[in-house]
UniProtKB/Swiss-Prot annotation:
It catalyses: sulfate + ATP + H(+) = adenosine 5'-phosphosulfate + diphosphate. SUPFAM superfamilies: Adenine nucleotide alpha hydrolases-like. It holds the Pfam family PAPS_reduct. Heterodimer composed of CysD, the smaller subunit, and CysN. This is Sulfate adenylyltransferase subunit 2.
Amino acid sequence: MSEHTFARASHLSELEAESIHILRETVAEFANPVMLYSIGKDSQVLLHLARKAFHPAPLPFPLLHVDTTWKFRDMYAFRDAFVARHGLRLIIHRNQRALAEGINPFDHGSQKYTHAMKTQALLEALAAHGFDAAFGGARRDEEKSRAKERVFSFRDRHGQWDPRRQRPELWNLFNGRVDAGESMRVFPLSNWTELDVWHYVLRERIPVVPLYFAAERPVIDRGGTLLMVDDERMRLRPGEKPEIRRVRFRTLGCYPLSGAIESSATTVETVIHEMVNARQSERQGRLIDHDEEGSMELKKREGYF
């Protein structure tokens, strides 16, 4: 093993140990935790860490998928197969009122759509099941508002985040005290980077959604963003015509709001090689991050994960 490879392995092991400590600490401090499962690579890594943390026992908490009904078909297929294969407890929650009103990413815009189908749906699910802590796979390197968020992120009785009320976190000490109605969002992957995640996927052979790998897919170019035409609900603007391009996704969300990148990376190793030379943000293709200045922080203040 080369010195560089040994250093990488040691670094990943340190991150793994830290995340497992956070998972166990949360389960010890809270009465009713849950893990948000968005089906992406970070969720897969977090779930893998959780299964390690509590092995050989089953997970001491369920998974929660906030379903907008607009995820990629490959994501739904992967979710159902993975959960069934491993016998996991999965709660699927949808904002039924928003669905009845026909809220969608085309007619209502990304802000209203995200607030209704993601933020409000998440708050509904947490309240309905009485969860006092919710794990998420967010990382500090993803976006500037996440960069300043604590591992234990306190939320008030309305599920909202106030950056000025964050608690100090000294070394590996976490304050999980909450009053009735308050809760905590917990981010065990806070100190990981996108590259760390992919190296860990490679080391642990963690399965991920095929959309992360390059393949011939039907896309349209909308203002410089490549959007995949995943089903018949995709609305084309005048002059738009789907064309087949070799693309993959660095981050996955709702398909009308997730941009692809042209790529030839078909394996984890080639994705890592591509990542080393990347000069653009991982979330550049997430259109919900760009609907206004400070968009992510505003969403998090409202209760978004």
